[in-house]
UniProtKB/Swiss-Prot annotation:
It catalyses: riboflavin + CTP = CDP + FMN + H(+). Mg(2+) binds at residues 143, 145. GO terms for molecular function: magnesium ion binding; nucleotide binding; riboflavin kinase activity; sequence-specific DNA binding. This is Riboflavin kinase. It comes from Archaeoglobus fulgidus (strain ATCC 49558 / DSM 4304 / JCM 9628 / NBRC 100126 / VC-16). It holds the Pfam family HTH_24. The lineage of its organism: Archaea, Methanobacteriati, Methanobacteriota, Archaeoglobi, Archaeoglobales.
Length: 233
């Protein structure tokens, strides 16, 4: 009995998915705004199905009240009903919930001690001035170093693909300092930024975070602790 219910549910979901596929194809032809003339053959080409399948799906949509369909000697005319638009809108809202959150990602990392390089670079006025202007805060002279575990590396690689905030390189009498890509972030509600130098000897699984405060002290962190960083893309 339970298996029969599960099987029924599966086919119910499959039917809705198939209906949405056809509704979307019709909507892309402006059938939510006007009556469109379309043959079953044309629809079959749009959805990659046979002529018979396309005709059957149109009949199913009509039976469910999702479209109004009129057959005349001049052809087949279709318009999506309010019920059909509501089904499309619900699907749209589901996807909106998924992709609206794409503006941020969350990365977990293990705290570890660096060798003090972060303090040196963050203290350079050529960078600090841009941090204040572009990130909106004057950073504590130091970085929180995080080692990203393998299972989180997909999100770390995302940062390489994103544009981020460009911190321009500069030169002094002694040497040239390269560009840095930055992403604003939050750790336990505290603002900060991930900084990724274009030239670095650190491997890809290492991230450095700057903040107006010393994050280790503010959050009571020690080597080996894991923290979650919410990164704003």
């Amino acid at each position: 009995m339970v298996r029969d219910i599960k099987t029924f549910k599966f086919f119910e979901v499959l039917l809705i998915y198939e209906m949405l596929e056809v509704l979307k194809a019709l909507a892309m032809m402006n059938a939510t705004r006007k009556v469109v003339k379309i043959s079953s053959k044309e629809l079959a080409e749009h959805i990659g199905q046979s002529l018979q399948t396309a005709a059957r799906k149109l009949k199913e949509l009509e039976d469910e009240g999702l479209i109004d369909r009129t057959l005349t000697k001049d052809g087949q005319f279709v318009v999506i009903t309010e019920k059909g638009k509501q089904l499309l809108y619900k699907e749209y809202m589901d996807y909106k919930k998924i992709f609206d959150d794409e503006g941020t990602i969350k990365i977990k990392g293990e705290v570890f001690s660096g060798v003090g390089e972060g303090r040196y670079y963050v203290s350079l006025e050529g960078y600090r001035k841009q941090f204040r202007e572009k990130l909106g805060f004057d950073p504590y002279p130091g970085t929180l170093n995080l080692r990203i575990p393998k299972e989180e590396m997909y999100f770390r690689r995302r940062l390489d693909e994103e544009r981020g905030i460009l911190i321009e390189g500069f030169s002094t009498e002694d040497r040239t300092f390269g560009e840095v890509k930055a992403f604003k972030c939050r750790i336990n509600g505290i603002e900060g930024a991930i900084v990724i130098p274009k030239r670095t000897h650190y491997p890809a699984e290492i991230l450095e975070v700057i903040s107006p405060v010393k994050l280790r002290d503010k959050l009571g962190l020690k080597d080996g602790d894991f923290v979650e960083v919410e990164v704003i893309l």
